[in-house]
A protein has these predicted regions:
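C-terminal regulatory/interaction module of P-loop NTP-utilizing enzymes
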Residues: 1-269
Length: 269
């Protein structure tokens, strides 16, 4: 089992990213990952877990998510229901406490990788509300008068699409890395992870067209890595001759998701 992250069979990581992951693990600090959509931020956590032989726990953050959700939930409604119908054990408050994803990570007997995904989707108070728990690796449950302490400090990876600026106090506690969009050479390596025995001409033509499209003036939503992978799947499924890609972009709707971008493409292809 590896003790340091050096990528995985399914994830191509740059040297800078590998070094940053290992520094965050060594310093026992959360790793904050930013980058445009489709650069592999979320997949990084799975790759780290796979490479280090750890279980992955995922906390998907939404606009309605509160920090409390990650700690525990007290099902007071169920307890009230049980008390009305005389169900046994209603006095045992622990029955109605369900740990959230952070609570699960703290309670795990072995070290886990905890992914807090898209933290910037929540309100501005969300990151600050987690400062104590991430610093001290513990939280208090007043309903049971118990403190939940991390048995093993989890490896915490936090992703952000930079939709909102995160508080300075939160940033100071993190190791930060911005995942740059892959250069063509690295992208080719990524494609070879996803596809075995892919036609060499198809790889060259599709990559040339993809990067040309990303640089095309007027494109508002540039296609991402995941959309490139889907596009190549479409090209293979459609039996497209690689030579055709020099003249047009087949199945452009797999790459471009805005009407305006499709219209921009039609003007030049």
């Amino acid at each position: 089992m590896d003790t340091k992250f050096s990528g995985s069979a399914n994830y191509v990581a740059s040297r800078d990213l590998m070094e940053t992951v290992n520094i965050a693990v060594a310093l026992q600090k959360p790793l904050l990952i930013k980058g445009e959509p489709g650069t592999g931020k979320t997949m990084l956590a799975q790759a780290v877990a796979d490479a280090l032989g750890k279980k992955l726990i995922i906390w998907n953050v939404k606009s309605t998510t509160k920090a409390q959700d990650g700690l525990y939930v007290y099902d007071v409604v169920q307890r009230l229901y049980d008390s009305q119908f005389g169900n046994a054990g209603v006095d045992d408050v622990k029955k109605y406490i369900k740990l959230g994803k952070l609570g699960e990570a703290f309670s795990a007997d072995e070290q886990v990788v905890l992914l807090i995904d898209e933290i910037d989707k929540a309100d501005l108070e969300f990151p600050n509300a987690l400062l104590w728990e991430l610093d001290r690796m513990e939280f208090y449950i007043p309903e049971t008068k118990e403190t939940v302490q991390a048995k093993q400090r989890p490896i915490v990876i936090i992703t952000s699409n930079a939709e909102k600026e995160l508080p300075d106090a939160f940033l100071r506690r993190c190791v930060f890395h911005y995942i740059e969009f892959p250069e063509q050479e690295q992208m080719e390596a990524i494609l070879r992870v996803h596809f075995e025995n892919l036609d060499e001409q198809l790889i060259r033509q599709s990559l040339t067209a993809f990067y040309w499209l990303r640089e095309l003036r007027g494109i508002e939503k540039k296609p991402s890595t995941s959309e490139l992978v889907d596009w190549i799947r479409a090209l293979v499924a459609g039996g497209v001759d690689p030579a055709r890609i020099e003249k047009e972009i087949p199945f452009a709707g797999v790459l471009l998701k805005k009407d305006k971008d499709l219209q921009t493409l039609r003007k030049v292809k």
